[in-house]
């Protein structure tokens, strides 16, 4: 606020707070008054305190299997009235967007607005502030605002903040992460100038000049670079158990789209799906994410892929994915998204942001380990350094410094459990009794418990002590493995050496 010399603050409250119940109204009003008093005393623009306009929550809508309106609107109405009372007594602005009409189907989950819902919200907000109807939208102006917001969001809610403002800021990130943030600020300002030019009639089209954005400094590999080898030469260096054979199913040499693979998964047709990210560790100024999910097929049964299809190519660091509901659930920090091919052409053409607000302070610790539980819920987790705050129709979910999540697609209910400090979240599976076992590089332990009150955590678990980094595991129950290995456990190590162990 100080950096932007803020004159006016639009402050939206009431939705998350409402889940505390109407008995918390006195506390809510007291905290709201305290916020107003403190904010008024800060001259962010260097002259005087900002004007404050409170914005009520929007009404919830009932959807199939998600009775959000029935669950929440009575409480939301009470909290909206409380906000109006505080605004009147403090003599500040207030806009009631709760009691305004919204078309059916204005939300993605009964709670969060879609494009049509935001159009209705924008109209209600404009009328509430200026007491008149807005002019027809200038589409070019709207697109300019969207473009600015995209660049501003990358500065306001960036990935990997633990490396330039958090605990590792003195060791990593300061050479390129901080200059990148500065460049995003410059790019957002450049787009702001284009917005004003269109709004004032000086320009009719978006015209952006980024010539003032400096080049990022060159960086070095502090640990030294890897020695790149062909798949054939790499295979020659493998030490292989004599009971097994290993062949290269697909290589980047033959299929360039599978550069930087993160996760693989086989489908019911015997095709290998691969999530790849060249965007990692995050988007840099002037770039756009173009990560992929690629399908590899062996069409002639020779044990090698001979066909490659890019199923989705505009993803943002897809650390994990899982099939479901005729499509694919994907991790795209801070979002949890759903993709689907609706016309059968072999490429995703439908995309929905199911949930958002997941932590991204360390981008390779974000949502990972997607797997269906035996009772039909989608299980996943995040890891240390992250702070997740997710709004749902059933109330906010908060996790600090790692936690597990369970998601029910039918009702879109999200739960969290078993919060304890754990590191890189790479490896989860179920035994034949339905117990889930998870690994992480430092402790390689498993722990099950309901959550203590946020933000406290359980102590670190005592389990199988780790000996190195781990990045995958599975119980052996495949006929292709030797009989004496059935019922055993396979684990993958990634440091100090790459090994698959039994």
Language-model segments: residues:
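Extracytoplasmic/secreted cell-surface and envelope-processing proteins
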Residues: 18-23, 62-65, 103-105, 363
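Conserved catalytic region of serine esterases and O-acyltransferases that act on ester linkages
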Residues: 47, 105, 109-226
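Beta-propeller domains with acidic blade repeats across secreted/periplasmic ectodomains
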Residues: 210-502
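Substrate-gating cap/lid alpha-helix
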Residues: 60-97
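Oxyanion-hole/transition-state-stabilizing segment in secreted/luminal serine hydrolases
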Residues: 1-29, 60, 152, 156-163, ...
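A short helix->loop->beta-strand "cap" motif at the edges of active sites that frequently abuts
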Residues: 40-51, 92
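Structural recognition of the beta-strand scaffold that forms the well-ordered cores
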Residues: 7-13, 51-56, 93-96, 112, ...
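Generic structural signal for well-ordered alpha-helices
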Residues: 32-37, 80
């Amino acid at each position: 606020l100080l950096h932007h010399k803020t004159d006016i603050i639009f402050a939206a409250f009431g939705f998350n707070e409402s889940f505390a119940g109407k008995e918390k109204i006195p506390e809510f009003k007291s905290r709201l008054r305290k916020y107003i008093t403190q904010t008024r005393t800060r001259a962010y623009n260097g002259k005087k305190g900002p004007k404050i306009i409170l914005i009520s929550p929007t009404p919830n809508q009932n959807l199939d299997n998600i009775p959000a309106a029935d669950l929440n609107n009575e409480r939301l109405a009470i909290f909206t009235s409380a906000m109006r009372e505080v605004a009147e007594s403090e003599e500040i602005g207030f806009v009631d967007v709760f009691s305004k009409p919204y078309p059916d189907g204005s939300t993605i989950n009964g709670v969060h607005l879609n494009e049509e819902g935001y159009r209705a919200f924008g109209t209600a907000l404009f009328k509430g502030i200026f007491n008149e109807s807005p002019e027809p939208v200038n589409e070019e102006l709207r697109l300019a605002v969207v473009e600015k917001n995209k660049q501003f969001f990358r500065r306001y809610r960036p990935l990997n903040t633990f490396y330039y403002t958090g605990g590792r800021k003195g060791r990593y990130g300061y050479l390129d992460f901080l200059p990148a943030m500065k460049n995003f600020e410059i790019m957002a300002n450049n787009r702001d100038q284009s917005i004003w030019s269109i709004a004032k009639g000086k320009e009719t089209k978006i015209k952006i000049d980024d010539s003032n954005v400096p080049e990022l400094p060159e960086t070095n590999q502090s640990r030294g670079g890897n020695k790149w080898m062909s798949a054939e030469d790499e295979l020659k260096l493998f030490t292989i158990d004599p009971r097994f054979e290993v062949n290269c199913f697909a290589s980047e040499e033959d299929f360039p789209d599978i550069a930087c693979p993160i996760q693989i998964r086989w489908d019911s047709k015997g095709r290998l799906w691969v999530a790849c990210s060249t965007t990692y560790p995050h988007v840099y100024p002037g770039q756009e994410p173009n990560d992929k999910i690629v399908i590899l097929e062996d069409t002639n049964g020779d044990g090698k892929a001979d066909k490659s299809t890019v199923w989705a190519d505009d993803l943002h660091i897809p650390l994990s994915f899982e099939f479901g509901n005729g499509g694919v659930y994907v991790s795209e920090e801070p979002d949890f998204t759903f993709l689907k091919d609706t016309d059968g052409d072999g490429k995703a053409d439908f995309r929905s942001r199911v949930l958002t607000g997941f932590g991204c302070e360390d981008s390779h610790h974000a949502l990972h380990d997607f797997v269906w539980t035996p009772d039909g819920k989608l299980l996943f987790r995040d890891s240390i350094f992250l702070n997740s705050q997710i709004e749902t129709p059933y109330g906010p979910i908060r996790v600090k410094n790692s936690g597990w999540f369970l998601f029910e697609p039918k009702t879109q209910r999200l739960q969290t459990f078993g919060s304890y400090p754990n590191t890189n979240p790479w490896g989860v599976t179920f035994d034949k009794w339905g117990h889930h076992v998870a690994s992480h590089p430092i402790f390689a332990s498993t722990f099950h418990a309901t959550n203590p009150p946020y933000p406290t955590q359980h102590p670190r678990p005592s389990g199988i002590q780790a000996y190195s980094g781990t990045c995958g595991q599975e119980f052996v129950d495949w006929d292709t493995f030797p009989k004496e290995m059935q019922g055993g456990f396979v684990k993958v190590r990634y440091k100090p050496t790459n090994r698959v162990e039994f």
